[in-house]
């Protein structure tokens, strides 16, 4: 028996933003003697709090949380870096006789962990949006100059006006630290992940999810989101950083730059987050072996269904 087949799959609790993943993760951890590894690309950053839905310390019920609040907001943290750290944390948690639980909605992170030698050409949402804005404001040739500074080999193979491939090459390099030239012949099936994942996904009613997103967005602005962005900018965090490219933060930056009014920033943020939730659901529906649970993570029947599945259900293939 190989090491991989002898080990239990690592549990991942995923779903769209505002679906109650964090609450469900804590409840499952309490039942399984678990510790949580954050799998959200925004919650890794220090100093950004208001719009990140990080669970406050006093609400974690004593459950240790890892890979949260540990990256300076001026640093563009990649999926590859997260996957390496997550793999280490999984081993550390298991060495203590406890159960690691991956909790979050960043599918790209999970894919990087599942396939440590392959990163899909898809990228995280904030990076793609920033590159789109860069191209719209400065043109495709500027984007090609950016690629040339990052990855001369890829730039030499692409025409400046072929912006979709230029942008893809930038995304791959920033996410993996490797040239797309080195990755273009790789396929996910060519590599085996060192650990299997058992992915449990929340599927709340769409209309209720969107209502929750709209209300949470308004709550974030009322809780001081604009002041938080002003503070981060005053600390020298670049406005085009991954941290400030996150949903909510990006539109506030535009508001502070005079590109839109505050009501417009709020409404656009609601739309952005609703679209993002839809894309998250689409992403996980395309992942193999995902087990779906209808409802929000705070619902007792959802917790009961998840615990029942974990007690006797088969792992994802």
Where are these regions (language model features)?
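Phosphate/pyrophosphate-binding catalytic cores of soluble transferases and nucleic-acid-acting enzymes
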Residues: 1-317
């Amino acid at each position: 028996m190989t090491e991989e087949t002898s080990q239990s799959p690592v549990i991942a609790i995923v779903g769209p933003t505002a679906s109650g993943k964090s609450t469900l993760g804590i409840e499952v951890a309490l039942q399984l003697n678990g510790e949580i590894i954050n799998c959200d690309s925004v919650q890794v950053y220090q100093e950004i709090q208001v719009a990140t839905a990080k669970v406050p310390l006093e609400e974690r019920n004593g459950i240790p949380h890892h890979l949260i609040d540990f990256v300076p907001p001026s640093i563009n943290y990649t999926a590859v870096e997260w996957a390496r750290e997550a793999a280490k944390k999984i081993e550390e948690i298991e060495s203590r006789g406890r159960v690691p639980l991956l909790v979050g909605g960043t599918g790209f992170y999970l894919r990087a962990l599942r396939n440590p030698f392959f990163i899909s050409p898809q990228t995280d949402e904030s990076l793609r949006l920033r590159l789109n804005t860069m191209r719209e404001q400065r043109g495709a040739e500027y984007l090609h100059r950016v690629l040339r500074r990052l990855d001369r080999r890829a730039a030499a193979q692409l025409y400046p006006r072929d912006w979709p491939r230029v942008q893809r090459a930038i995304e791959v390099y920033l996410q993996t630290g490797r040239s797309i030239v080195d990755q273009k012949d790789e396929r996910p099936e060519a590599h085996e992940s060192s650990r299997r994942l058992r992915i449990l996904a929340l599927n709340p009613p769409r209309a209720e999810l969107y209502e929750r997103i709209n209300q949470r967005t308004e709550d974030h602005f009322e809780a001081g989101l604009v002041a938080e962005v002003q503070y981060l900018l005053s600390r020298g965090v670049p406005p085009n950083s991954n941290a400030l490219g996150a949903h909510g933060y990006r539109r506030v930056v535009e508001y502070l730059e005079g590109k839109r009014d505050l009501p417009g920033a709020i409404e656009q943020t609601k739309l952005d987050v609703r679209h993002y939730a839809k894309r998250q659901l689409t992403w996980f529906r395309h992942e193999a072996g995902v087990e779906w649970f209808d409802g929000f993570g705070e619902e007792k029947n959802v917790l009961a269904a998840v615990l029942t599945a974990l007690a006797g259900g088969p792992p994802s293939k």
